[in-house]
Amino acid sequence: MPPSSPPASTQLQSRLFRLPRELRDVIYHHYLYNEDGLIYSFETNKLPVDLSLTYTCRAAALELRGLALRLNKVVFCTTYPHAIRTHAFLFHRALSELHALKFNLLNLQAPRLLTEAIQKEVSVKYPQFSRVLPTLGTPGERPNTLGEPPSTYRDFVHFTLNLLYDRKHHPKLGGKRSERKRRSLRKVNPEPWSTPNERGRLPRGAEGKFGYCAQGRLGHDLAATFDRELQQLVDITRTHDRVGTMKHSLSAAACAIRFLRSLRVGTREHVRQIELIEDRESISFPECHGRGLISFCREHPKLRVHRRVSLWKNAFPVTSVIRYQLNGRYSEDDRLSSSYVSKAVAKWMVEASILPSLGMPEGSFKLTFECDSAPAETTQVFNVLQRDAAWQTALDLSYARHILPQPTWHQRRLRKAYVYETFPELLEQVTNCDHPFIHCDFHPGTVCNPEEIIRERRGDSLEEWRAAWLDHTPREFQTPANMPPWHVLRAGFIVWDVWGGARFHG
């Protein structure tokens, strides 16, 4: 129902208001509609909407209220704000360090503090990780999502760590200062989709001056103080030339969340369509940033979010070694490796697939993998995913049929040929166009038959299976003809992980 306006007789000074409301609505549509949508500006935190007509009179303002947001999609792109480049770099590094440190602390304290009651409570909330709990405390144990969505694994670690230091379970826990400092770590859980400089996340002020201690690396001091904010981290990094040479971009989803949070509820309720163009590598676990949109979709049932992920410029780019040095050496040798591409794409799939279980309303969210105008070449890469999904299924069938020795729960999930628990099923749904909200704008490859793999490998040992899985054909891909070479396409946009390497496949 359009907003009511004063009778036309009171607006005789304007020819516009002598027209019927239906004709005025047509004029408003032509005046406000933009086929390309309203492109968000991070610098201004605004949209390019011409509101001149709303200032002519109250009647026009009333009839036009919120119409631009209802008529147009709002478009957000992966953004590199030069003004906060150091903030973005530090936030990304701090977040990566934080989650690594939390797991280390959990692994260190579990033998002393993990009770049966805590194990039971964790197993109820995170049953998929119930078999992880008895192994906590193993020397040398490293963080591994064990086939579950990475964000779920981080939630599990945070939840369990909180229980370890909960006075409900350990009422007499206290004591020395270092123990209190360790306990404070459990409270820190910043949202990955928070944008640097957002109030309450990272402080404003001179770049590089965040109050971090200049002594030692974070991972070397489990007793580091983590009070209220992420800026209390201890020496997350040395701020070196990499800040200036690499573009640590913000995801389109993070930009959208920033904008939506800045709107009043009365304004936000007019937004109907959001398009997220994820066309570059970005910071802070971008594949899980859809979680930050759940509350808005629940609050506004008419809101529809379409997340478009560029495969060649965003999802595909991973590497297994440090090939990108600051001086450019070795970069020309880099290619898209077949050994890591399945895990890279599957991570986006599994993170999106759990959104409904976290509260995303049905029909509110859609994820599209885009081929960047190279459908044939992208299909060839997806044939690797099809092959790896079939291998994961073939191995599971071989275990069940006693063709291969039955592995332990951990052994199965740590093997090279294992991607994610739900990966084969998700890829099959996407290939058959059966998934309700994950799609491709190209043909997603040819399905492989796991039974054929079992027949071909019958009689092989587990070691021979492992060697055969590593023998991908082709082993690597160069970019399609319509794009720059792989190392040029990635140059300047590589998101480096906490250990100094380029974004890793896991």
Predicted segment positions?
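Short alpha-helix boundary/capping motifs
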Residues: 88-89, 295, 302, 332, ...
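A two-mode feature
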Residues: 306-321, 410
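Acidic, metal/cofactor-coordinating or nucleic-acid-engaging core segments within structured domains
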Residues: 316-357
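Short, surface-exposed structural microsegments at secondary-structure boundaries
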Residues: 1-273, 278-301, 322-329, 355-356, ...
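Conserved beta-strand termini and adjacent loop/short-helix elements that scaffold enzyme active sites
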Residues: 76-79, 308-310, 370
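Short, hydrophobic/proline-enriched secondary-structure or compact coil segments at domain edges
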Residues: 269-277, 362-371
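Phosphate/pyrophosphate-recognition segments in soluble nucleotide-handling domains
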Residues: 254, 307, 335, 343, ...
